[in-house]
Amino acid sequence: MNEETGIPDDNLLTIEQAIANLQSEDLGLRVYAAWWLGRFRVNVPEAIDLLIAALADEADRTEAGGYPLRRNAARALGKLGDRRAVPALITSLECDDFYVREAVAQSLEMLGDNSCVPYLIELIKNPNPEASADTEPEHPYDAFLEALGTLGAVKAIPHILPFLDHPIPKVQYAAARAMYQLSEPMVADQYGDRLVAALANDDLQLRRTVLSDLGAIGYLSAAEAIGNTMAENSLKLISLKGLLEKQIVLATPPDLTDGAIRVMALMDDLL
């Protein structure tokens, strides 16, 4: 345990060693240190500064053009919750590494700073018209859409709507998730119902994606469908936990809402 931060050290690194390793010439040590600092939520100024600097790293690049250190730094900065990282993360949305852009969007979503919204909207404005379910997307559109939904970017709605018909299913689901979050209650349910219908997909990985989306939006009408989905109980429980958390907010202690009681009964059945 580090006495100043209260953060537990693991058997391989201490906080001081991780910070030192992030400045090492050994690229492997730097990549691991960036991951470690995020994993253990080492929210100290020196770590934040070094991770921000790592977003511009040019030394660690794969033959395919990827930036492993930048990816880990971006992921860590989202977990650490310091909004000083937002400007550098926004700049990193221009990185030509798909997975850096994905990690950046996810971290901007976690940080909850709306200053990134105009940049995310620009990135979804002109999707490739020749995209198909069999080709890799040019951008991590699902991550962009999820961030816009979480950030309450209502002005992005006209640009999100076309993605409901995107050829890649998980992008469709991300669009439905965002539209549920951004729409008025009287129309939001149609997007939640789209996700419920997608739980019947033959592809297990896509069913897992939808479970995550339904948990994120806390769509109560999906509760029974989640419980009956052909997927791992652990994932169904995580999804139902998302629904339960939404219901807890609506409750007046010590009472629970009927929805919370309903979800808890379903969770008990899965344990």
Swiss-Prot record:
Gene3D superfamilies: Leucine-rich Repeat Variant. Its EC number is 4.-.-.-. The keyword rRNA-binding does not apply. Keywords: Antenna complex, Lyase, Phycobilisome. It is an enzyme of class 4 (lyase). GO terms for molecular function: lyase activity; oxidoreductase activity. It comes from the Bacteria. GO terms for cellular component: phycobilisome. Pfam families: HEAT_2, HEAT_PBS. InterPro entries: ARM-like (IPR011989), ARM-type_fold (IPR016024), PBS_lyase_HEAT (IPR004155). Required for the chromophorylation of the cpcA1 gene product. CpcE and CpcF associate to form a lyase. Belongs to the CpcE/RpcE/PecE family. This is Phycocyanobilin lyase subunit alpha. The gene is cpcE1.
